[in-house]
Amino acid sequence: MDVYFIRILDGQGDYDYDLETPFLEKDDTIKTLKMFESMLYVNSSPVTYYQWFNMLIDIVNTDSPVEPEILFASLKSKDDEAHPKEKLKYDELNYEDVDRYWFWRLDFQIWLKRKELFLVGDDATPQNNDIRRAIDVAEKYVFKRNRSIEHIAPQTPLQEDTLKLEKEDRNCFGNLVMISSEQNSALSNSIYQEKRARVESFLDSSRSGSIESLKMLHAFTFNKSWSLEAIKEHGDTMYKILLQSYD
């Protein structure tokens, strides 16, 4: 039965996950299941870990092997019940009230739909190097714990910023990402252009670092500048992705 559970290959921080099932030929489905279990794991704590762990045990506690697509659908259904769509309210996705679970769920959904979300129009071919690079980064995304909420447009910029926001707009979902405390410290009070340049340097490997939020990747990929209009549009797009994750 333990073959259905993710294993952390390296517990020192730069970890990856492994997952064994009897259906090795279904690589794409197994990867989706592994990513979903990883999302549930990083969202858990020592207190809540066994909630999703027990959900998985209930599904695989059978004499017959469980197909990975059935296991994923069943596990996601149980998670949907634990986090019902009715609790997903845009006004509550703000800096002061948001449950970090929604950021994890959003990153999983962006990973799952990465090609269609980063492609433009009906063309199945990436439009430029930035899009191709973003899809590649999303493909290799790894869920990690120890995340904190960061403002894209900072609360107290280190230098003069032409973007002036009311507190409600600054703290809204469209202006938030969830990253590590280390990256948060490095980026926290930088203006948008500096943050985007730093993320670009992560992408082209000119600076050490990684993309810790697919929501952030999407924002920086499609917005060369940051404005109240861009914040609202990004927030609406991300909220729509969350809603569609229940379909």
PLM segments and residue spans:
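Flexible coil/loop and intrinsically disordered segments
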Residues: M1-D247
